[in-house]
Amino acid sequence: ITPEEIDIAISDSRGLFYAAQTLQQLAQTDGQGNTTLPLGVIKDYPDVAYRGTVEGFYGDPWSHTDRIEQLRFYGKMKMNTYIYGPKDDPYHSSPNWRKPYPEKEAAQIKDLVKEAAANKVDFVWAIHPGLDIKWTDEDRMNVLNKFGMMYDLGVRSFAVFFDDISGEGAKADKQADLLNFLQKEFIEKKEGVSPLIMCPTEYNRAWAGSDYLDVLGRTLDPAIHVMWTGNSVIHDITLEGQEWVNKRIQRPSYVWWNFPVSDYCRDHLLMGPSYGLDPNAAHAMSGFVANPMERAEASKVALYGVADYA
């Protein structure tokens, strides 16, 4: 920024959008309506390719209005990812994950996809089939068909969650078979689709007592992202922890950070700053999303820190 002009060097349209956000945030208007910008050079780029939030908490899901406002906030804060996975949406999880959304909810998904695009945010729709999935060709096609329904609503980014389940649905080899099928028959065949994301059943180090993660590492298509919460469900993110899991899954993990989520302490508002994030760990992850509170506006304080970190 010089007295004569503003030069912007970008690599894509998202970069231009972010540059505009920076200029708007720097602009100052005096009492006479004159707007000024500080002079200087600004170098602004992310440390993590995919960064934002995962609506993955237990409790009342955000309202449609909450989600629209959140997407606008993410654009301003230069976060490019919103993963839709509210645990209490019956069409995301059981009992209705096999079924299409009703007309009203389908229209809202379309609205969210449109608003996300306007704010340069990837709207990622997640399915959570593990509570009652049958490892049959019929249910394999049910997942594929549900992805097709969401694609027709405008969704271009997808995730499959196998968290917080037990029994038949928690088998690593069966999960990998399904995910590899989706990768081959949907992700690679549909136009404009982003890499597939999965949340494993053993999603933190404290629970990783079997060969589950090793099976995923060996058998899962390397293009598929694998999520991870750290050394426990709620934990600091450290370089040592990232290196441990990355070796097991044979790829950089996609961090699901459980802050400021408060579904384990519902009588609290977690509005402090984000902390416990090792800046040296950012290069050892493929993505970083925070799980917020069911109180959307109150979550913005911590999410600001997430944007600053990533």
Predicted segment positions?
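Feature activates predominantly on carbohydrate-active enzymes
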Residues: 2-146, 152-156, 188
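Catalytic-core regions of glycoside hydrolase
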Residues: 28-31, 57, 146, 153, ...
